[in-house]
């Protein structure tokens, strides 16, 4: 397979500064670019650390040592962080923490990165309305972000991540604060997303299996299974 159409992790390890134990240990796996990769595992399995590595957050923002290879299509955070970052949308576990804090309204928050990129005003308005509609935030565009519920803030974080049209999405438990209807809407939306490579951590395993092309299972920082959902869960059965 052309490596520009492949996700390739080889011997990936991550250790945070000041912590002796590695959070990720020698992970090697391949998948197809443009697929949805579901990441599951128990508490402290390394799911968030893998998201941070895939997003390039470690070591550029959070101090740590990353060794091995991360290649997502033609992009790699190891080789060109700036170019990789421009094509990557990230949603962290704490959605409020990744909002700018500078926007008066939900619409302004969604538009924040587009404004910084110098996108024309008419395009900004169109793209903001589009992603707000996709994520069920159309009625909240004139509200202050601080007035939103936890689930709405998660949807706002997703909106800010996708409005720049990245080719890679890294979503770390993006539905943890959503109610059942919100989660259902999110996974229905995710099915409709095209031409993006999506890495998603979720405890909603049944929903994840419905939409994921591959499941990666982590345990104590190691990859213990990877493959199509049915294959993986048959393998994990006692």
Pin down the residues of each PLM region:
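ABC ATPase NBD Q-loop/coupling interface
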Residues: 69-83
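Conserved ABC ATPase "signature" region
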Residues: 122-140
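Conserved H-loop
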Residues: 204-210
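Conserved ABC ATPase signature
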Residues: 144-148
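Catalytic Walker B motif of ABC-type/P-loop ATPase nucleotide-binding domains
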Residues: 169-172
């Amino acid at each position: 397979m052309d490596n520009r159409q492949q996700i390739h992790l080889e011997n990936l390890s991550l250790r945070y500064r000041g912590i002796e134990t590695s959070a990720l240990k020698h992970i090697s796996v391949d998948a197809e670019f443009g697929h949805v990769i579901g990441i599951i595992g128990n508490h402290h399995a390394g799911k968030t650390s893998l998201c941070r590595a895939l997003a390039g957050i470690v070591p550029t923002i959070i101090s740590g040592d990353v060794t091995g290879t991360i290649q997502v299509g033609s992009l790699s955070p190891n080789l060109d962080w700036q170019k990789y970052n421009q094509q990557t949308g990230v949603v962290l576990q704490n959605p409020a923490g990744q909002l700018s804090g500078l926007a008066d309204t939900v619409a302004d928050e969604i538009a924040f990165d587009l404004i910084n990129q110098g996108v024309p005003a008419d395009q900004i308005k169109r793209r903001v309305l589009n992603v707000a509609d996709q994520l069920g935030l159309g009625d909240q565009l004139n509200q202050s972000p601080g007035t939103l519920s936890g689930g709405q803030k998660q949807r706002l974080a997703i909106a800010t991540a996708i409005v720049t049209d990245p080719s890679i999405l890294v979503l770390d438990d993006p539905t943890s604060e959503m109610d059942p209807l919100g989660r259902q809407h999110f996974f229905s939306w995710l099915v409709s997303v095209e031409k993006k490579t999506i890495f998603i951590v979720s405890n909603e395993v049944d929903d994840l299996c419905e939409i994921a092309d591959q499941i990666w299972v982590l345990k104590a920082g190691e990859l213990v299974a990877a493959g199509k959902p049915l294959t993986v869960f048959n393998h994990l059965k006692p």
